[in-house]
Regions:
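Preference for short coil/turn "hinge" residues that link or interrupt alpha-helices
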Residues: 63-64, 70, 98, 103-106, ...
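Conserved catalytic core of two-metal-ion nucleotidyltransferases
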Residues: 68, 75-83, 89-91, 131-172
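Surface-exposed loop/turn and secondary-structure junction residues enriched for glycine/proline
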Residues: 64, 108, 113, 169-171
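Short, functional N-terminal and low-complexity linear motifs
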Residues: 43-53, 102-108, 153-156, 172
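Active-site nucleotide-donor binding segment shared across nucleotidyl transfer reactions
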Residues: 79, 83-131
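N-terminal regions immediately upstream of nucleotidyltransferase
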Residues: 1-95, 113
Length: 172
């Protein structure tokens, strides 16, 4: 391996790590969310975090930062926001449900103004026990200002849909 190419790769990785740290500190965001006393306060805090990160990403774009780093940075910010929104819900059985990023967002590529494609994956086909928590999660996401494209399916339903539709298979 050429040392010059290694240095270039290390610099690119360091720049991406530096950008992620600059955009959002997950620990700090989690602590701030835990200290929110109302839903309105949580919404304002999450909206502000997204707006601040977007402003940094916009500035980095103007400074010719790699587009790849920018779209990965944007996805990383949304990852943190979704973790908080998901964690605020009262899940009847948190081990039988999962939030899965799919599509471009699932690849870590989130362009400005893109929708955020999510699969809410359940162990069983009947997910009525989760209806209220899913509704609360999606409502919180929409209130934050996120454009969510979502589906709620069991593993078996995902397999059936993927067998029928190649676009579902590639999105998964």
């Amino acid at each position: 391996m050429n040392f010059d190419s290694l240095s270039i790769k290390e610099a690119a990785v360091n720049e991406t790590v530096s950008l992620s740290a600059e955009l959002l500190d997950p620990m700090q965001l989690g602590e701030r969310a835990a200290n929110c006393e109302s839903s309105a306060e949580l919404l304002a805090m999450l909206r502000d975090a997204i707006a601040q990160a977007s402003a940094i990403l916009d500035e980095r774009y103007k400074q010719n930062l790699s587009i790849t780093d920018i779209v990965h940075g944007r996805a990383s910010v949304i990852d943190q926001v979704l973790r908080i929104a998901w964690g605020r819900q009262q899940w009847p059985d948190q081990f039988s449900i999962a939030l899965v990023a799919v599509g471009g967002y699932g690849r870590g590529e989130l362009l400005p103004h893109s929708d955020i494609d999510l699969l809410i994956l359940t162990r069983k086909e009947k997910h009525t026990a989760y209806k209220e928590a899913i509704s609360g999660f999606l409502t919180l996401c929409w209130d934050i200002g996120l454009e969510i494209g979502q589906s709620v399916r069991s593993v078996k339903q995902c397999q059936q849909e993927a067998a029928k539709d190649i676009t579902v298979a590639t999105a998964l």
